[in-house]
Amino acid sequence: ENKQRGIKEIYEPNETNSQTAEIDLYQLMLGRRSVREWKKDKISDSMIELIVKAGLSAPNSCNRQTNKFIILKDEARIRSVASTVKGGRNFFYKAPHLLIVINDIRRYQFPDEIHTPFQDAAAAIQNMLLMIYRMGLGACWGSYTSNTSLILREKKVKKLLNIPSHYFISGIIAFGKPNMRVCFIPRADISDSIYFEKFK
């Protein structure tokens, strides 16, 4: 029946190892940290493709699958993007790779979907950050997004990268082989962060 519907596989959780997988995933989440210093070494295309596949596997609104990914490896192009973005993202200059997530805004037709492309991109970005860390690499999410205060800068980036006007720039990841050690930063306590039934 699934083949007739064009579905090749259905994901079925494996009960025998689900507990171990859950622990491994949780430790992966706890261990991931933002890295802003990298070696100059480039990452292979096969590793980059695996990172993007992790992004493609993320949930997205109405299964639109609008996330597109532009990978920058050329140093001059990376510097051009970094100089355009500016702000507190000077670490972009040091990155051996930039990964830019864009979304086709024509696929979001209703007024209440104005933030939906950013949500779709954020889910993909988190998946990719975890995959990058799992591969022994380091990354930092630059949180660059399309908004009115950055519209002129965004136009420059779009022109530089040949991005059509009907696409949002939804986020940028800088990544590569880490050249720094990142200390553990305590997170907010669960007792101060969770509320049942209503906010207090």
Per-region residue spans from a language model:
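Acidic, surface-exposed loops and disordered segments
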Residues: 1-200
